[in-house]
A protein has these predicted regions:
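Extracytoplasmic thiol/disulfide redox context detector
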Residues: 2-92, 170, 207-214
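C-terminal cap of thioredoxin/glutaredoxin-like
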Residues: 5, 140-214
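Sec/Tat-exported extracytoplasmic proteins
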Residues: 56-59, 70, 74-77, 104-108, ...
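Solvent-exposed loop/turn segments at secondary-structure junctions
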Residues: 59-62, 89-93, 119-124, 154-157, ...
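Conserved strand-to-helix beginnings and helix N-cap segments that scaffold or border functional pockets
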Residues: 64-67, 94-98, 192-195
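Extracytoplasmic/secreted envelope proteins and their assembly/folding machinery
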Residues: 67-74, 97-101, 114, 131, ...
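Structural microenvironment flanking redox-active thiols in thiol-disulfide oxidoreductases
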Residues: 76-107, 111-139
């Protein structure tokens, strides 16, 4: 009996490292290291889907470079994922750019204007410091002046700008770009190590949320 017990103990001891390795493999990325847990989860727009929300700023060169990776990645997201963007608003100049984003969305020209606004600020070095400069950019790309002014100054756009600012603050965003997964997790280059890894961590967290919904 003693020999049997000793054999079982030896076998159990030998298997412990394998079990530990299996746990490590299952948790490919670690909270607090590769991503951050949002202390108080933020409600999502559609609880039936996994929300992915990029917090960005048109004046951020890192956000502009991230677009080349983010855009094709976002297009490949499955049907159970709701992809959103939230323009950051930390100071008055950023509010101008956020309102440009929501105005473009309201007018149905966001798909075209999103990259145009980025290019204007990052390559052409336009400050887009006020409404008139935003209006001029839109008019130069085919939007009627009356339409863009009406949208930019609308209650809806102003409300969305305030709500987006509040949402980003609730996420605890530290910089741009950051990706928020289902209002629960925050992914940044600082934690993930690179923009490429941000998307890998995001994929991991999307899968994590999907498995939790089953």
């Amino acid at each position: 009996m003693k020999k049997l017990f000793a054999s079982l103990l030896l076998l159990t001891t030998a298997l412990l490292p394998l079990a530990a390795n299996a746990d490590t493999a299952g948790d490919k990325y670690t909270a607090g290291k590769d991503y951050q847990i949002i202390t108080v989860p933020v409600h999502t727009a559609n609880p039936d889907k996994i929300e992915v929300n990029e917090v960005f700023w048109y004046g951020c060169p890192h956000c502009y470079h991230f677009e080349a990776l983010l855009e094709p990645w976002a297009k490949r997201l499955p049907a159970d994922v709701d992809y959103q963007r939230t323009p950051a608003v930390w100071r008055p100049a950023m509010e101008v750019h956020a309102r440009a984003y929501y105005a473009a969305k309201q007018l149905g020209v966001l798909d075209a204007m999103h990259n145009i606004i980025f290019k204007a600020m990052q390559e052409e070095k336009k400050a887009l410091k006020d409404e008139d400069e935003v209006v001029a950019l839109f008019v130069n790309h085919g939007t009627a002046e009356a339409d863009i002014r009406k949208a930019y100054d609308s209650f809806s756009v102003q409300s969305q700008t305030r709500q987006g600012d509040a949402r980003a603050r609730s996420y605890g965003v530290q910089g741009t770009p950051e990706i928020i997964i289902n209002g629960k997790y925050r992914v940044s280059t600082e934690d993930a190590g690179s923009q490429e890894n941000m998307l890998k961590v995001a994929d991991f967290l999307i899968a994590k949320e999907r498995s939790g919904k089953k």
